[in-house]
């Protein structure tokens, strides 16, 4: 019997942060973007409703969910993609936009899944140096080549906690070639109260 060989991706595995620390019982972990409050009691009540028929496959297009999201954020539902967490959306972006030998720029310290999914499709990951643990617009622009297809960044950034201002983010978009996709990960936007900050959603949804 011939056993098929696995394809050797030669990529690093995702390494999650610590969830437990010795001698500490009550820990609020922010790095995984998990709710420290747990599930909403209202959500629990709705899920327990037998009329929902959760044993059936859901709508693959998530039309109802996208419609409700579009109402809340005042944007076109046709511009909304739903996924099983940001991981799946990042994976879809890489599969749709990247070919082998294309280049993807990511900050020096950033969410590992950007580089993992880019590597899986055969793209080259290029790291832009951070200055004092802050994403640098000039360093990203300096790394751009004719092969650059995507720039991934989280704003505010995980794990550094620093951020690009509204002015810096708009400057980056302006300086990038129009053919380069700028992916702004807003996972931690709700923590930002600084007046000079604007989420990618607020800046680019239209």
Task: Please state what every model-predicted region is.
Residues 1-56:
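N-terminal "arm"/small-domain region of PLP-dependent enzymes with the aminotransferase-like
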Residues 33-36, 86-87, 111, 155-160, ...:
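Short glycine-rich anion-binding loops that position phosphate/pyrophosphate groups of nucleotides
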Residues 29, 150, 181-182:
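Hydrophobic "anchor" residues on beta-strands that sit immediately upstream
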Residues 38-40, 90-91, 114-115, 160-161, ...:
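Glycine/Thr-rich phosphate-binding loops of Rossmann-like dinucleotide-binding domains
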Residues 135-146, 159-182, 186-206:
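Active-site pre-lysine segment of PLP-dependent enzymes
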Residues 63-103:
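Phosphate-binding glycine-rich loop
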Residues 96-153, 174:
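PLP-dependent aminotransferase-like
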């Amino acid at each position: 019997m011939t056993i098929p060989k696995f394809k050797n991706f030669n990529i690093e595995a995702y390494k999650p942060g610590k969830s437990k620390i010795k001698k500490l019982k009550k820990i609020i972990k922010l790095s995984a973007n998990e709710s420290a409050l747990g599930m909403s009691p209202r959500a629990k009540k709705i899920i327990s409703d037998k009329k929902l028929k959760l044993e059936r496959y859901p709508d693959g297009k998530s039309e109802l969910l996208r419609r409700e999201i579009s109402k809340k954020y005042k944007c076109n539902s046709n511009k909304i993609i739903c996924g099983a967490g940001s991981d799946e959306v990042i994976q879809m972006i890489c599969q749709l936009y990247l070919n082998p030998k294309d280049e993807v720029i990511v900050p020096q310290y950033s969410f590992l899944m950007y580089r993992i999914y880019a590597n899986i499709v055969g793209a080259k990951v290029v790291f832009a140096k951070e200055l004092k643990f802050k994403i640098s617009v000039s360093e990203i622009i300096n790394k751009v080549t004719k092969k650059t297809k995507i720039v991934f960044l989280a704003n505010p950034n995980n794990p550094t906690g620093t951020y690009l201002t509204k002015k810096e983010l708009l400057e980056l978009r302006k300086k990038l070639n129009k053919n380069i996709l700028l992916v702004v990960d807003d996972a931690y936007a709700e923590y930002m109260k600084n007046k000079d900050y604007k989420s990618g959603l607020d800046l680019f949804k239209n």
